[in-house]
Amino acid sequence: MINIDYIKSKIRDVPDFPKKGIVFKDITPLFLEPKIIEKIVDDFADFAKSLNIDAIIGAESRGFLFAAPLSIKLNKPFILVRKPNKLPNDVYSAEYTLEYGSSRVEMHKDALKPNQRVLIVDDLLATGGTVAAIENLVRQAKGIVAGSVYLIRLGFLKGEEKLSGKVHALINY
């Protein structure tokens, strides 16, 4: 039986990556066991069902790893949010800061219709900067953020305080 403790045991801490002072949570070992991913997606689906969503937004790149199978499981559209200059059509754009730098995210303008309710999926919630920027994209498209879901939440960074909608994480540190 796969439980939270088992999943946590497979996540590696990598000190000083991508820069000094950061402890990176390496989730790649989880993907060596498909049943772990199935358990994570099932948990995310249970949360999503309570939100009455119309679409799922995945954050590049590790958010895609969970958003794609979740969209298939729930039969909901999957909207990709990518780093700058990776989408070929007209985009909404939003700036943000990370735990270890700053960047921008983009979403196709025709991906989300006004008043659609979305669930944002990412692997990790740290400072909340990435997802706050994605929420900005949703507002630009006149959509509604129903919530966001993560494999890992670093609670000590209080990222959820920057976010709207319900927040759920399978693992909390």
UniProtKB/Swiss-Prot annotation:
Q: What is its main location?
A: cytoplasm
Q: Which GO terms describe its molecular function?
A: adenine binding; adenine phosphoribosyltransferase activity; AMP binding
Keyword match Phosphoprotein: no
Q: Which domain of life is it from?
A: Bacteria
Q: Which CDD domains match?
A: PRTases_typeI (cd06223)
What EC number(s) does this enzyme carry? 2.4.2.7
Quick one: a GO biological-process term for this protein? adenine salvage
- The leader peptide range reads none
Catalytic activity reads: AMP + diphosphate = 5-phospho-alpha-D-ribose 1-diphosphate + adenine
**Record's subcellular location:** Cytoplasm
List where the protein spans the membrane. Answer: none
The pathway is: Purine metabolism; AMP biosynthesis via salvage pathway; AMP from adenine: step 1/1
- Respond yes or no to whether keyword Nuclease is given for this record: no
Q: What are the GO cellular component annotations?
A: cytoplasm
Q: Which UniProt keywords apply?
A: Cytoplasm, Glycosyltransferase, Purine salvage, Transferase
Instruction: Cite the InterPro entries for this sequence.
Output: Ade_phspho_trans (IPR005764), PRibTrfase_dom (IPR000836), PRTase-like (IPR029057), UPRTase/APRTase (IPR050054)
Family label: Belongs to the purine/pyrimidine phosphoribosyltransferase family.
Query: How does this polypeptide assemble, per the annotation?
Result: Homodimer.
Q: What does this protein do?
A: Catalyzes a salvage reaction resulting in the formation of AMP, that is energically less costly than de novo synthesis.
- This protein's name: Adenine phosphoribosyltransferase
Originating organism = Ureaplasma parvum serovar 3 (strain ATCC 700970)
Taxonomic classification: Bacteria, Bacillati, Mycoplasmatota, Mycoplasmoidales, Mycoplasmoidaceae
State the encoding gene. Answer: apt
